[in-house]
């Protein structure tokens, strides 16, 4: 049985198999062909962090695959009242066919998976957001930016950055990361990614100059400067990230046909300008839709590898 906790757990071929499934299922969906790959299966969806895209995409996705989604907030189950994660896992995994968890600590997700009898999917943790990176790569393919791309991540060294590191390392493309001093990536995750990159041939570089990172890139991406749970740091962060807003001046340094990706929600006037966001809106909202299709590919792949 396999879980989907971080991209680190898969080889290149397996990740591309999931992407291929996502492409196939998306094409079928567009033709109104809803193939019941997961007929009568139940997806338990545990949310300790709220979300728009994660809930809608997983709940819609499992339904389109012939199953049903069961939404469980921390307040709906005993987990929110102190039941140990391992006990919650041993109960829920006896009643459903797959579990998606959106939570804070990666360790909680891993504990749940360790005791689960069914596949577990990382819907987001403070350390990683792997379903989003599968989504982003699917979007890159659709917009012709997946053939030996040069990608730049500009902003906070957070769960999105960590997942970009793993995707680049596994697939072997070039990634440039620019973060303000003091907001760099987790050094342990960086070490893991760099070790993997030695085998794949990926070129991963780090710096504190966003303009230098973006030069000649095919793909530019960023994320919010203030993630959930960091609201008390907002003013300090806004000052630290001055000069990191992706605007037309910054995008002009990338290739003329470069695309801009954002996992949403976007805060215009902070990490991205209104003009740049709207100029790349078709890509961004295709990316948002692709959460649905990428996650269906992941769920079907996991079911096939139980």
UniProtKB/Swiss-Prot annotation:
BP term (GO), one: L-arginine biosynthetic process
Q: Which residues bind L-ornithine?
A: 159, 223, 227-228
Pfam families linked: OTCace, OTCace_N
**Which InterPro entries would you find in this protein's record?**
Asp/Orn_carbamoyltranf_P-bd (IPR006132), Asp/Orn_carbamoylTrfase (IPR006130), Asp/Orn_carbamoylTrfase_sf (IPR036901), Asp_carbamoyltransf_Asp/Orn-bd (IPR006131), Orn/put_carbamltrans (IPR002292), OTCase_ArgI (IPR024904)
Q: What does this protein do?
A: Reversibly catalyzes the transfer of the carbamoyl group from carbamoyl phosphate (CP) to the N(epsilon) atom of ornithine (ORN) to produce L-citrulline.
A single GO CC term for this protein reads: cytoplasm
Q: What is its EC number?
A: 2.1.3.3
The main location is cytoplasm
Name of the protein in its database record: Ornithine carbamoyltransferase
Q: Which PANTHER family match?
A: ORNITHINE CARBAMOYLTRANSFERASE, MITOCHONDRIAL, ORNITHINE TRANSCARBAMYLASE, MITOCHONDRIAL
Question: Catalysed reaction(s)?
Answer: carbamoyl phosphate + L-ornithine = L-citrulline + phosphate + H(+)
Q: Which UniProt keywords apply?
A: Amino-acid biosynthesis, Arginine biosynthesis, Cytoplasm, Transferase
Q: Which SUPFAM superfamilies match?
A: Aspartate/ornithine carbamoyltransferase
> Pathway listed for it?
Amino-acid biosynthesis; L-arginine biosynthesis; L-arginine from L-ornithine and carbamoyl phosphate: step 1/3
- UniProt gene name: argF
**From the UniProt record, which GO molecular function terms apply?**
amino acid binding; ornithine carbamoyltransferase activity
PROSITE patterns registered for this protein in UniProt: CARBAMOYLTRANSFERASE
